[in-house]
Amino acid sequence: MGSRVSREEFEWVYTDQPHAARRKEILAKYPEIKSLMKPDHNLIWIVAMMLLVQLASFYLVKDLDWKWVIFWSYVFGSCLNHSMTLAIHEISHNFPFGHHKALWNRWFGMFANLSLGVPYSISFKRYHMDHHRYLGADKIDVDIPTDFEGWFFCTTFRKFVWVILQPLFYAFRPLFINPKPITYLEIINTVIQITFDIIIYYVFGVKSLVYMLAATLLGLGLHPISGHFIAEHYMFLKGHETYSYYGPLNLLTFNVGYHNEHHDFPNVPGKNLPMVRKIASEYYDDLPHYNSWIKVLYDFVTDDTISPYSRMKRPPKGNEILE
């Protein structure tokens, strides 16, 4: 159903990602940006409050009709859970407690993970660091879709289905592209999460458990906030690999929309990324950017020139050190 996309292959490039060179140039001109590279201790209480709100919602939905359980999981729970995945993104960069307390951040990530219903935090951190170091690297960066995704989801309707199924692809894609041995922290993350899920089931009932899981699945699929998955690196304009978003949903997502700024300065917490743009405005104001994630989703589905193949990809150099 729907028209077929014109792209049949990834955009292969043989140059380094632009972020390291731009970071070096900006720091030489604006060394004060180094002062923004510091922990964000506010994340600790923000995440705790988010988890408490979600626990309260488990209580509020436990006796609702099923239609209202699903309704509120999409309208409210999905926003909270997607926001929590982006809090976990901040935690993966060691922002709550700082780099000198890396293990504290891993434990805090497991705490933040609780409201999602599925173990996520530890595995995300391992793959996300590879994404930053080796952006677009073949068989390393699992943010790049598989060849199957690019080949199969090649019509308007199929791209729409692909957007809905985004959380499943992000969950299983690493197993096909860059499988890693399981670590003890991932096992602990899984055991803690399953234990929490069982407690939710026995304390609140099956409706609260379904609400929690549906909020994660729906929130990471066809949802306004999910526009960031596509907006960040899908090549809407040839030659441009990373795009920022400067719209209001940054307030719910720890400024993940400031994505060029984030890749240029991964040691700057989200709350300080607007300052990076302000200080080095001449480097960012003229770069292509978005003001609406909803429009990004619409354009991705309806534009015949855009598909899961619309990513810049690099052959690995062979000297990569993976997490």
Swiss-Prot record:
A GO biological-process term: ceramide biosynthetic process
UniProt PTM comment: Myristoylation can target the enzyme to the mitochondria leading to an increase in ceramide levels.
Tissue: Detected in testis. Detected in pachytene spermatocytes and round spermatids. Expressed in retina and retinal pigment epithelium by Mueller cells (at protein level).
Sequence intervals crossing the membrane: 41-61, 68-88, 104-124, 152-172, 184-204, 209-229
Motif Histidine box-1: positions: 89-93
EC id: 1.14.19.17, 5.2.1.-
Subcellular location: Mitochondrion membrane; Endoplasmic reticulum membrane
Motif residue range(s): Histidine box-2: 128-132
Listed GO CC annotations: endoplasmic reticulum membrane; mitochondrial membrane
Topology class, membrane: Multi-pass membrane protein
Motif Histidine box-3: where in chain: 259-263
Keywords: Endoplasmic reticulum, Fatty acid biosynthesis, Fatty acid metabolism, Isomerase, Lipid biosynthesis, Lipid metabolism, Lipoprotein, Membrane, Mitochondrion, Myristate, Oxidoreductase, Phosphoprotein, Transmembrane, Transmembrane helix
Lipidation (N-myristoyl glycine): 2
A Pfam family matched in the record: Lipid_DES
Any GO MF annotation of the entry: retinol isomerase activity
Highest taxon listed in the record's lineage: Eukaryota
Record field: catalytic activity: an N-acylsphinganine + 2 Fe(II)-[cytochrome b5] + O2 + 2 H(+) = an N-acylsphing-4-enine + 2 Fe(III)-[cytochrome b5] + 2 H2O; all-trans-retinol = 11-cis-retinol; all-trans-retinol = 9-cis-retinol; all-trans-retinol = 13-cis-retinol
Modified residues (Phosphoserine): 307
Function of the molecule: Has sphingolipid-delta-4-desaturase activity. Converts D-erythro-sphinganine to D-erythro-sphingosine (E-sphing-4-enine). Catalyzes the equilibrium isomerization of retinols.
UniProt subunit comment: Interacts with RLBP1; the interaction increases synthesis of chromophore-precursors by DEGS1.
Family of this protein: Belongs to the fatty acid desaturase type 1 family. DEGS subfamily.
Name the UniProt record assigns to this protein: Sphingolipid delta(4)-desaturase DES1
Organism annotation: Mus musculus (Mouse)
UniProt gene name: Degs1
